[in-house]
């Protein structure tokens, strides 16, 4: 299959969280075009079954392939945990997740080999971060804590609200007591709560945001497979945004997260795929 090097990269998430990954791709791979899909009609993914998440991911990948993308980033930890292996086997296109990149960094930066992971119930319950970390260093102890209210709070725009601070304090208390020195933000929504989480955990805990490392991993993949954009045919605005619901609300969030104003977000019927 001949690949168009100047085709866009597809990025998808359950909602707005994957924009933190898209932002890092824009910063680190500025020549690459991006097609972003946020599944805002079905957010959050964290409380849904493996079979449901795989089904959602298949639909989204079919849509992104219709947009002629050359590679896909699953910018959602829950979908990476539950669906990545299945869709990599099923589709003839390079597909990256966000879990391994964060785990590798956490293993490098921890000093006392006690690593915390916060994420949705699905991500933490899957044990995937512990599995990856133990492969890198069997001596690492992994303490997981589901934080199911974080995604709805972020999607509501309450990133600095006193309610969010109170919820975060309750969730993170357990991790504070476990003497971790490294904390993986195991959901792409969570970097939007970084200041609140960092304030609660204190300077002694390193926060790992897998978004940056995922962008670098994508860059390596594109280089290895000779798929880097040549920069030819670059439009004035090389990014397209699609959602399954609430297009205007999504656009408002995107404008606060990305370094430019998103002029158009298109709602599509993802169930058709």
Where are the model-predicted features located?
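Non-catalytic structural scaffold of enzyme domains
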Residues: 1-273
């Amino acid at each position: 299959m001949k690949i168009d090097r100047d085709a866009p990269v597809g990025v998808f998430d359950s909602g707005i969280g994957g924009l933190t990954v898209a932002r890092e791709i824009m910063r680190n791979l500025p020549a690459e075009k991006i097609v972003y899909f946020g599944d805002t009609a079905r957010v959050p993914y964290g409380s849904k079954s493996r079979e449901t998440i795989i089904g959602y991911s298949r639909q989204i990948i079919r849509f992104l392939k219709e947009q002629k993308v050359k590679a896909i980033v699953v910018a959602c930890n829950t979908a990476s945990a539950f669906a990545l292996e299945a869709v990599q086997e099923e589709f003839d296109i390079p597909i990256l997740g966000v879990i391994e990149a964060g785990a590798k960094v956490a293993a490098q930066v921890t000093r006392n080999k006690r690593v915390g992971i916060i994420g949705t119930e699905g991500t933490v319950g899957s044990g995937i971060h512990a599995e990856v970390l133990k492969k890198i260093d069997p001596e690492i102890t992994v303490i997981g804590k589901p934080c199911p209210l974080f995604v709805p709070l972020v999607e509501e725009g309450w990133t600095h609200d006193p309610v969010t601070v109170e919820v975060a304090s309750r969730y993170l208390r357990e991790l504070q007591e476990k003497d971790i020195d490294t904390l993986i933000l195991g959901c792409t929504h969570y970097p939007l709560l970084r200041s609140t989480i960092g304030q609660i955990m204190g300077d002694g805990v390193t926060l790992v945001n897998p978004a940056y490392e995922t962008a670098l991993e994508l860059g390596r993949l594109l280089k290895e497979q000779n798929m880097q954009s040549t920069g030819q045919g670059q439009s004035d605005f090389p990014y397209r945004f699609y959602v399954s619901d609430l297009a205007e609300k999504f656009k408002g969030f995107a404008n606060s997260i990305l370094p430019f104003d998103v002029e158009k977000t298109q709602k599509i019927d993802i169930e058709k795929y």
